[in-house]
Amino acid sequence: SLFELGKMILQETGKNSVKSYGVYGCNCGVGGRGKPKDATDRCCYVHKCCYKKLTGCDPKKDRYSYSWKDKTIVCGENNPCLKELCECDKAVAICLRENLGTYNKKYRYHLKPFCKKADPC
C-alpha cells in the first residue's frame, strides 16, 4: 500500500515521500505518466511499469509485510502478488536513494500536462 511505500522511501532516502516525491516530475506520485525529466523521475516511471505487471492485488490499498534488517528492506509474503508488490516498492525506494544526487527542486511540483508522452513499459 501507499503506507509501506512511503515508509520504505523514508528509510532509504530520509525524505518524506509525499513532500519530496508526491508530484515530482512526470511520473512520481499520482497522475499521468510521461517522458522522465531526470534519473529520479525515471525511478518512478519504472515503478509504475512494475505495478502494471501485477495481477491479483491493488498496489495502492493492499498491505504487505516487510522488515528492515541491517539497513536493508526484506520483503516477506506468502501471497505471490503481495511479494511482487513489495519488490516493486523496494526497487523504487532503492532507486530514489541511488539517485538522490539528481533530485532537482524545479521538478518537485511539475505540472503533468507539460509532460511528453512516454514510451510504453
Swiss-Prot record:
A biological process from GO: negative regulation of T cell proliferation
Keyword Disulfide bond: yes
Localization of this protein: Secreted
PROSITE patterns: PA2_ASP, PA2_HIS
Subunit structure: Homodimer; non-covalently linked.
Site description Cationic membrane-docking site (MDoS), residues in chain: K112, K117
Protein name, entry field: Basic phospholipase A2 homolog blK-PLA2
Keyword Ribonucleoprotein: no
Primary localization class, coarse: secreted
Function: Snake venom phospholipase A2 (PLA2) homolog that lacks enzymatic activity. Shows myotoxic and edema-inducing activities in vivo. A model of myotoxic mechanism has been proposed: an apo Lys49-PLA2 is activated by the entrance of a hydrophobic molecule (e.g. fatty acid) at the hydrophobic channel of the protein leading to a reorientation of a monomer.
Positions bearing the site annotation: Hydrophobic membrane-disruption site (MDiS): L111, F114
SMART domains in UniProt: PA2c
Entry GO CC: extracellular region
GO molecular function (one): calcium-dependent phospholipase A2 activity
CDD domains recorded: PLA2c
Tissue expr: Expressed by the venom gland.
UniProt family annotation: Belongs to the phospholipase A2 family. Group II subfamily. K49 sub-subfamily.
Region feature Important for membrane-damaging activities in eukaryotes and bacteria, mapped onto this chain: 105-117
Chain coiled-coil ranges: none
Cystine residue pairs: C26-C115, C28-C44, C43-C95, C49-C121, C50-C88, C57-C81, C75-C86
Domain of life: Eukaryota
InterPro entries: PLipase_A2, PLipase_A2_Asp_AS, PLipase_A2_dom, PLipase_A2_dom_sf, PLipase_A2_His_AS
Keywords, sorted A to Z: Disulfide bond, Myotoxin, Secreted, Toxin
Annotated site, Important residue of the cationic membrane-docking site (MDoS), chain positions: K105, R108
